[in-house]
Amino acid sequence: MSVIGRIHSFESCGTVDGPGIRFITFFQGCLMRCLYCHNRDTWDTHGGKEVTVEDLMKEVVTYRHFMNASGGGVTASGGEAILQAEFVRDWFRACKKEGIHTCLDTNGFVRRYDPVIDELLEVTDLVMLDLKQMNDEIHQNLVGVSNHRTLEFAKYLANKNVKVWIRYVVVPGWSDDDDSAHRLGEFTRDMGNVEKIELLPYHELGKHKWVAMGEEYKLDGVKPPKKETMERVKGILEQYGHKVMF
C-alpha cells in the first residue's frame, strides 16, 4: 500500500530552493514556530491536501526538460518535509529512477533516527539545512523550540558526508550580531560536507498570511537588514573557511 503525503502546494519552476530550475513541493505541517515564517499557513499537520507519489510524479515529469537543461530537479520544502520522511523517501526514490536531482529543504528537527531517515538520505542529493540561531536561548525565543535537535542533525549529516548547503536568515536584532555569526562559523568550521552558506535577508513577505489568520505578527516593524550588515556577517563566516553567498 502506497504512503499518502499531505502537502500545502507546489511550485513548478522555482529558482531559489536549490540548483537550477526546480519543482518544489511544500509539505504541510511544522513543529517550529518561527516569528518570521513566511509560510504560516503550512504549520497545521492536518491541513493541506492528500497526495500520492504518483500524483506528484505526473506533475514532475511535465517539467523534466526545464530541470535537465538547467541542472535542476525537485525540492521537498514546507512546512517541514522531514515530518513526512517516509513519503518524501518514496517520492525521491521515484525521482532517482527518472534520473532527477533531489533536494531536502529542512529545519533539521528530527525527533527519531529510525531507518527511514537513513533511507531518505540515501536518495537525497542535497540537503539545505536551516540553522536559525546557535545561541539556544535566542533560538527558543525566535522559533519556539531548542536548537538541540537541529544541531544534532547537522552533525549526523556531517558524519554521513551528506552534501549540505546551510541557510541562515539574518534577522535584525535576532541573528545579525557578530557573536551569532562567530558561533555559526565555529560550529560548521570542520564540516567538510558543507559546500556553502547562504545568507537570507529577513523580509516581511509572509506577514499578510499571519494577518489573514487573525494572528499577531510579532516582528512587525523590523526592517530587512542593510547590505552592510549582510557583508559584515558574510565576512565573519568567511574567516572560518566557508564559501558564503547572499
UniProtKB/Swiss-Prot annotation:
Compartment list: Cytoplasm
InterPro entries cross-referenced by the UniProt entry: Aldolase_TIM, Organic_radical-activating, Organic_radical_activase, PFL1_activating, Pyruvate_for-lyase_activase, Radical_activat_CS, rSAM
Principal location listed in the UniProt entry: cytoplasm
Cofactor notes: Binds 1 [4Fe-4S] cluster. The cluster is coordinated with 3 cysteines and an exchangeable S-adenosyl-L-methionine.
Residues given in the record as S-adenosyl-L-methionine binding sites: Y36, C37, H38, G79, D130, L131, K132, H203
Catalysed transformations (reactions): glycyl-[formate C-acetyltransferase] + reduced [flavodoxin] + S-adenosyl-L-methionine = glycin-2-yl radical-[formate C-acetyltransferase] + semiquinone [flavodoxin] + 5'-deoxyadenosine + L-methionine + H(+)
The protein, known as: Pyruvate formate-lyase 1-activating enzyme
Native source organism of the sequence: Escherichia coli (strain K12)
Top-level taxonomy: Bacteria, Pseudomonadati, Pseudomonadota, Gammaproteobacteria, Enterobacterales
Gene (UniProt): pflA
